[in-house]
């Protein structure tokens, strides 16, 4: 096996994650040639419908899986948490890499602080029912000012798009996966020359806190990358097994199995 076609979504974060995988793979197999491919999914195209109201699971993954099944690529790099619980029998998640930080970040605009103190009310961008449920208690009990009323508003788009909507709008807070911010900040400056600068500029306008897992358990697989291959590609599965983090893989699988019981 001399060359691999690696598919991901088109967002900066998805491309960064694909290259993160590629770097790990090349450290083990330096003679491999890697070709990176991107594709927009239905979840990328429809930016108006809240994720919880979209018609099916896999809005960020099913279109990519079709490409894999049709042999237009060799493997796909996903965020584990985007994958539906049942991926079917034509493909499988072969491995995962070392899991990044699974916690969430809460950003609050500095210029919203006075308003929050005066009204005892805060508005927060989050499209995740899990986060909305968990943050109700966290925001009221852990922030350094009294909060009586919390308003959650849906938001869609990639990280920088959401950050810009947050900073330009009237909403006070914004919740996002810490792993996503970490990966963007650690991106190769040559490949993404403006990304880091823009993100640092956005963050400088905010106060932020890391939300403990004890009050805001993450979704199974948050922070972990899933490498999906065709189920019959035994040679690729064997090759990839050399870079699998078995402990993180088992942890994600266990968490997803618990969800299937509900």
Q: What are the functions of these language-model segments?
A:
Residues 1-46, 53-54, 61, 80-86, ...:
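Small-molecule-sensing regulatory modules
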Residues 1, 69, 116-121, 168:
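Flexible, charged surface loops at secondary-structure boundaries
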Residues 103-126, 140-145, 150:
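Flexible hinge/capping segments at coil-to-helix
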Residues 92, 105-107, 224-228:
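Residues embedded in well-ordered beta-strands
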């Amino acid at each position: 096996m001399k060359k691999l076609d690696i598919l991901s979504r088109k967002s900066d974060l998805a491309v960064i994650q694909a290259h993160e995988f590629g770097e790990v793979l090349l450290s083990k197999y330096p003679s491999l040639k890697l070709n990176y491919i991107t594709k927009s999914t239905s979840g990328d195209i429809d930016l108006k419908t809240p994720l919880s109201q979209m018609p099916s699971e896999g809005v960020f993954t099913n279109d990519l899986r079709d490409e894999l099944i049709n042999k237009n690529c060799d493997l796909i790099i996903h965020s584990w948490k985007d994958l539906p619980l049942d991926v079917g029998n034509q493909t499988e998640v072969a491995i995962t890499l070392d899991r990044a930080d699974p916690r969430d970040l809460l950003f609050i605009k500095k210029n919203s602080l006075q308003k929050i103190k005066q009204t005892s009310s805060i508005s927060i961008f989050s499209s995740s029912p899990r986060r909305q449920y968990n943050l109700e208690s966290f925001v009221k009990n852990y922030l350094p000012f009294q909060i009586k009323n919390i308003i959650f508003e849906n938001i869609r788009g990639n990280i920088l798009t959401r950050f810009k909507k947050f900073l330009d709008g009237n909403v006070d807070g914004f919740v996002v996966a810490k792993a996503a911010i970490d990966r963007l900040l650690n991106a190769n400056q040559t490949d993404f020359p403006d990304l880091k600068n823009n993100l640092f500029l956005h963050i400088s306008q905010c106060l932020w806190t890391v939300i403990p897992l004890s009050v805001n358990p993450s979704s199974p697989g948050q922070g972990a990358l899933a490498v999906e291959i065709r189920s019959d590609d035994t040679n690729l599965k064997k090759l990839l097994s050399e870079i699998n983090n078995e402990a993180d893989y088992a942890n994600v699988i266990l968490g997803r199995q618990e969800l299937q019981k509900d």
